[in-house]
Amino acid sequence: MDAATNVKDVITVKQGLAGRLRLNRPRALHSLNRQMVRDMANALIEWRDDPDVRIILIDHTEGRGFCAGGDVVGISQDVDGHEAAARAFFFDEYRLNHLEYTYAKPGVAFMDGITMGGGVGIACPCRYRVATERTILAMPETTIGIFPDVGAGRYLSRLRGRLAQFLALTGARLDGAECLRLRLATHYLPSDRLEEAKERIIAQPFRTQAVLDELSEEFIPEARIMGNLAKIDRYFESDRLEDILDGLDAGAADGDDWARAEAATIRAKSPMACKVTLKLLVESPYQLHFVDEMRMEFGIMVRLIHHPDFKEGVRALLIDKDNQPQWRPTNPQVIGDRDVEAFFAPLPVEEQWRPFDF
């Protein structure tokens, strides 16, 4: 709730034959807080058996972002004084992600603008994911000392080649055309056609696929990332951070400016978070169901938010904004396999994440 205006941060409303989830926190780029994820989950639960709701639409009310992720500044502050609140945010957020993933009614996410972190988490479970010329999608969590969560281990590890490792380590930003080509989006619409698409879907949800097909852009811009696939597969072949950096350094020494830039990007991230991320991408394909993925991610997250890199990353990027994080440790070589594996140990049964029990 915005105390100044008494306006809710997410608007949940039935309209026509649709249930609408409208993110409404523009001054924070619609970043998610605990009340928002609880409100969205409660609405979805209410609409599960409502015959008047045939489809779910997820979008934002105004501004340049669909959803910039979770409210990590608030979470980092909670870790010190209200640790239970920090855990509760991820517990509830992952419940929303799982509820969407298993929801019987189709969903449409309009990823118009910045779509990062938690924004990816509420968009990717939807059957229809609409990108535009304004879409900027990324999972930049290693910048703040954590890892791509909200089911990203599952979504990223299903991409071709070594794209998962590249995107997760670097936090590289994808535009709408790249999202479409990589199948993170199902459709690419000009932003000036979105309102027409929503109106037609609300009126005739059974024609959602046809409506999006009819309004899709005929001429899609080039997906620039496709030109770097061979380099991504070569340089990011290993599951060891040290090997990846050594390979990029060797490429840079041979005059590859792309390799030089990506090596510098990764070295600016938390070494611990990067190593945990690579381990996640190894383990995620072995999680048979989405519930298993979310349970694993919760166990990792509730430990990693207590590592000093999380608070330091949030400070450097979002509070002081000096972009000079002091990681602990700074050298990935001193982080052993056992250090990383400790984050993946199962939590005690009473502390484990659980989905909604219907």
Summary of predicted features, one role per range:
Residues L189-K269:
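Amphipathic alpha-helical blocks and their helix-capping loop/short-beta junctions
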Residues I300, P308, E312-F358:
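C-terminal amphipathic alpha-helical interaction region
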Residues L245-G251, W258-G299, I305, D309-K311:
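Substrate-recognition/cap regions that form aromatic- and gly/pro-loop-enriched pockets
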Residues G151-T208:
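Contiguous mid-protein beta-loop-alpha structural module that forms a pocket-lining wall or clamp
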Residues M1-D59, H98, F356-F358:
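Conserved CoA-thioester-binding segment of acyl-CoA-metabolizing enzymes
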Residues E100-I144, F166-A172, G176, H187:
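Glycine-rich beta-to-alpha active-site loop
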Residues I58, D71, I122-A123, E178-C179, ...:
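Hydrophobic/aromatic residues within transmembrane alpha-helices
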Residues H60-R95, T143-G145:
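Glycine- (often His-adjacent) and acidic-residue-rich active-site loop
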